[in-house]
């Protein structure tokens, strides 16, 4: 061994080694301690850690600066496994679906409008563009009529009737968390909607002596569902508050709401008691107070007296003209 070291030379400086000198052995290559340094910065390796590239050794910092790619997502250097995709480099944990953030490194991805998406998200985006549903079981596009179960779309043939076991179609019905073919469902005494005449599987609205799907109990004028809000009945039809009063009731000129209770009729308009006030100072008025009309709104006597003389003359003349008609 002594003879071998006597003839050995440093891999870097090609010099020999003193008998008691500390020698660094790296994969069979021998170095003086001061010669075992980074090929770029010529500093010793922190804690002996180095990276080798094309026969040269580098400290971690210089190896990253010279050779390690930067992650397109986080901007950090990538040491270890590199994902090459979309003309960029990524850490495996940084390469994620642009929509759901699922890690794509081991499951693959699909390019979609410049985005990298997992296959389920790609299918959903494709279906949205085609105006179609995505099956929530197999994640494929549903080309035919979907079966809606617990508010999610499915291929009907993924399910069987809970009663007779028959493979289901899009006409299947949900009842208490179970799916039934239409014949079995209709035998169970399910309420029928007064609008569409089809069975009601979920919430039932009881109104006007009938039962309705929530979305089918609507205003006869605007056809918007009431969704639990108050409705008004007239000759067998239901109306929302706004259209009932537009058609049959009084709407306050000031707040544009239905007048509940007493109505103040003034200036050829209807007002809520609390809304009938001076349009200048907001003092509450009654029909017993003196007021004048200005810009189709009431003005109290005190505010009227503050008007310019010329304006008061014109208002008085206008009132006299209207009074003669």
UniProtKB/Swiss-Prot annotation:
Keyword Transcription listed: no
Primary localization class, coarse: other
InterPro entries registered for this protein in UniProt: LIMS1/2-like_LIM1 (IPR047944), PINCH-1-4-like (IPR017351), PINCH-1/2-like (IPR047946), Znf_LIM (IPR001781)
Domain of life, source organism: Eukaryota
Mutation effect (residue 42 to A): Loss of interaction with ILK and loss of localization to focal adhesions
PANTHER family attached to this UniProt entry: LIM AND SENESCENT CELL ANTIGEN-LIKE-CONTAINING DOMAIN PROTEIN 1 (PTHR24210:SF13), LIM DOMAIN-CONTAINING PROTEIN (PTHR24210)
Subunit structure: Component of the heterotrimeric IPP (ILK-PINCH-PARVIN) complex composed of ILK, LIMS1/PINCH and PARVA; the complex binds to F-actin via the C-terminal tail of LIMS1 and the N-terminal region of PARVA, promoting F-actin filament bundling. Formation of the IPP complex is dependent on protein kinase C and precedes integrin-mediated cell adhesion and spreading. Competes with LIMS2 for interaction with ILK. Interacts (via LIM zinc-binding 5) with TGFB1I1. Interacts with SH3/SH2 adapter NCK2, thereby linking the complex to cell surface receptors.
Function: Within the IPP (ILK-PINCH-PARVIN) complex, binds to F-actin, promoting F-actin bundling, a process required to generate force for actin cytoskeleton reorganization and subsequent dynamic cell adhesion events such as cell spreading and migration.
Protein name: LIM and senescent cell antigen-like-containing domain protein 1
Organism: Homo sapiens
Biological classification of the source: Eukaryota, Metazoa, Chordata, Craniata, Vertebrata
Gene transcribed to yield this protein: LIMS1
């Amino acid at each position: 061994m002594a003879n071998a070291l006597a003839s050995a030379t440093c891999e870097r400086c090609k010099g020999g080694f003193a008998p008691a000198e500390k020698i660094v052995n790296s994969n069979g290559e021998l170095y003086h301690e001061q010669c075992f340094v980074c090929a770029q910065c010529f500093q010793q390796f922190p804690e002996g850690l180095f990276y080798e590239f094309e026969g040269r050794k580098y400290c971690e910092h210089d190896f990253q600066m010279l050779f390690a790619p930067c992650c397109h997502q986080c901007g950090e250097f990538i040491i270890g496994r590199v994902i090459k995709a979309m003309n960029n480099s990524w850490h495996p944990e940084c390469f994620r679906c642009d929509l759901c953030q699922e890690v794509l490194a081991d499951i693959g991805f699909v390019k979609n409008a410049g985005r990298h998406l997992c296959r389920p998200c790609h299918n959903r985006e494709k279906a949205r563009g085609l105006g179609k549903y995505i099956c929530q079981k197999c994640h494929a596009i549903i080309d035919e009529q979907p079966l809606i179960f617990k508010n999610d779309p499915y291929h009907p043939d993924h399910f069987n009737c809970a009663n007779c076991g028959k493979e289901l179609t899009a006409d299947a019905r949900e009842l208490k968390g179970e799916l039934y073919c239409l014949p079995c469902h209709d035998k169970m005494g399910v309420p029928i909607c007064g609008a569409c005449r089809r069975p009601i599987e979920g919430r039932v609205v009881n109104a006007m002596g009938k039962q309705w799907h929530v979305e089918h109990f609507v205003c006869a004028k605007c056809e918007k569902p009431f969704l639990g809000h108050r409705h008004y009945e007239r000759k067998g039809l239901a109306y929302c508050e706004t259209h009932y009063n537009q058609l049959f009731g009084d709407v306050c000129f000031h707040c544009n709401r239905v007048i509940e209770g007493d109505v103040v009729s003034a200036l050829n308009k209807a007002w809520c008691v609390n809304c009938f006030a001076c349009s200048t100072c907001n003092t509450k008025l009654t029909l017993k107070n003196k007021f004048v009309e200005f810009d189709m709104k009431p003005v109290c006597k005190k505010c009227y007296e503050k008007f310019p003389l010329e304006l008061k003359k014109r208002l008085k003349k206008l009132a006299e003209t209207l009074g003669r008609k």
